[in-house]
Amino acid sequence: MVAAKTRTAAAPTRQRILDEAERLIAVKGVYGFTLQDIAAPLGVRVPAIYKHYLNRDGVLIEVSRRFIALLAGQFELRPELGAVAAFQVALDSFVELMMGHPAYVRLALVDFATPGGGMDYVKLAAGGSFKENLVRGPLAAMHARLRALLQAGVRSGDFRAVDATDVYRLLKAALLIRLVFPDDTLLLRQPHSREVRDTKRWIREIAARHLAPRRDAAIDPVHKPRRALGPTRRSARKP
C-alpha cells in the first residue's frame, strides 16, 4: 500500500500519524480502529497524537483532506495528445489513485452511504457536498477538466455527447465496486502490476462502450481502430 510504503521514521510525526491512519482504514475500515492502534506501530503514546490532532475525528478529517487534494488533481488535460489518448491517460491516473490509496476507497464508500451528500469528514475536507463540488470547492476544477476532455472527444468525433456527471458516476461506481466485490483483497495488500493493468483495461472498456458514437453502436468500441479507449498506440496522437 502507498501509505505503508511511504511511512518512514524520518517523516514528521504528523505525517506518520496520517500514513498509519490510512493503513488502518484500508485493513480495518473507517470506524474499525482507535488512536491507540495508530500510536502503537509508531512507538508513541496516544497523548503524542493529541499534540497534532484534537481527536480521532481530527485525524479522519485530515486523511479526507489528503484524499480530496489528490482527487482534485485528476482528469488532467493533455493538449499534446489526441482526445482518446488524453482520456486514456486520465482514466489510468484515476485507477492508480484509487488502487494506490485503498483507504480512499473505504472513505468513498462510507461517504456515499451517508445521508445528506456525504459524511462530515469528507464534506469538511471538500468544503461541501458532492453536488456543491460540481460547481465550486476544491473538486470543481476537476469536474471542469473532465467536461473539457469529453468535449474534445465529441469535437474529434470519437465520443458521443454525454453528461460529464454521468460519466463520473459510471467510472467511480464501477471502479469502487470492482475493488471491493466479490472480495476486497486488493485493498488489503499491494496490488500486482498485472492487476493494475487489468483494472485499467477494464475501466477503459467500460468508458469506450459508454462514449462510443451511436452510429458505431453495433461495433465493439474496444477493438475499433483509432476509436478505442483500450490500450492502443495508434490513438495516442491525431494526425
PLM features: residue spans?
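Amphipathic alpha-helical packing segments from all-alpha helical-bundle domains
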Residues: E76, V89, G116-S156, T165-R169, ...
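Hydrophobic/aromatic-rich alpha-helical bundle segments in the mid-to-C-terminal region
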Residues: V105-L109, E132, R136, V154-R204, ...
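Helix-turn-helix
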Residues: R16, E20, L24-G58, E62
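N-terminal intrinsically disordered/low-complexity leader segments
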Residues: M1-P12, R215-P239
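Short hydrophobic clusters on alpha-helical segments that form packing/core surfaces
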Residues: I17-I25, F67, L71, F94, ...
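Alpha-helical DNA-contacting segments of helix-turn-helix folds
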Residues: V59-F67, M142
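Hydrophobic alpha-helical connector segments
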Residues: E62, E76-R106, Y168-L171, K200, ...
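Amphipathic alpha-helical segments used for helix-helix packing
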Residues: M99-F130, P182-T185
